[in-house]
């Protein structure tokens, strides 16, 4: 959309109608989004406004021209470790800025990471995951469970370490072109996060430095 006041393009996310009728969800959605609106960092998609009009609840955010990291991985198959590290560092900087303000993302995955046409990496959807995870099941759950921390898999206490774990899974996918755990159901994948040892990424990514494998 075009912001006529400031003369810039913005992205708008609108809450689905089935969620808009849940007052508790809407209240949590607004609270979380308003908290995230206080985040300003080069590696975060900034939130400009939160509001509602005629029953539609929306978030106005920075418009990033580019593609998601998920699409980028699918196009390239596997990323070199140097490129993966560069992307991971930028994601980590964004996550750190949020954690410094006591904001946890809870849904770090390649679909929530944008790569702009200039090569800048930005994490999006801060403030949305917590509201969505509490009492709803979205179509994105199957995609998210591949990156969920063990504590998320068991519905336990979540803190900043969950985001770090998820970033580790994202790094694994960048260099191998696959996620470490997969299955036909969300439960099957979640159980693997809790119980299974992941195959070392060097099995799929030749010449991977030992230092990165340890991460």
Predicted region positions:
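C-terminal lobe helix-coil module of Hanks-type protein kinase domains
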Residues: 146-215
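Activation-segment/catalytic-loop signature of the eukaryotic protein kinase fold
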Residues: 50
């Amino acid at each position: 959309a075009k912001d006529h006041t400031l003369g810039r393009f913005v992205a708008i996310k609108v809450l689905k109608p089935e969620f808009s009728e849940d007052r508790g969800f809407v209240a949590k959605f607004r609270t979380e989004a308003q908290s995230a609106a206080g985040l300003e960092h080069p590696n975060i998609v900034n939130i400009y406004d939160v509001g509602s009009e005629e029953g539609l609840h929306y978030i106005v955010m920075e418009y990033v021209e580019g593609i998601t990291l998920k699409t980028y991985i699918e196009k390239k198959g596997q990323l070199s470790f140097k490129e993966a590290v560069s992307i991971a560092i930028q994601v980590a900087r964004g996550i750190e800025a949020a954690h410094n303000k006591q904001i946890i993302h809870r849904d770090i995955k390649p679909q929530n990471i944008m790569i702009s046409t200039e090569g800048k990496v930005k994490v999006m959807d801060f403030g949305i995951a917590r509201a969505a995870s509490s009492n709803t099941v979205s179509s994105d759950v199957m995609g998210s469970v591949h990156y969920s921390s063990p504590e998320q898999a068991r519905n336990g206490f979540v803190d900043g370490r969950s985001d770090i774990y998820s970033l580790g899974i994202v790094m694994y996918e960048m260099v191998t072109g696959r996620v470490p755990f997969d299955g036909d159901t969300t439960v099957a994948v979640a159980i693997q996060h809790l119980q299974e040892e992941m195959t070392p990424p060097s099995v799929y990514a030749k010449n991977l430095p030992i230092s990165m494998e340890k991460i």
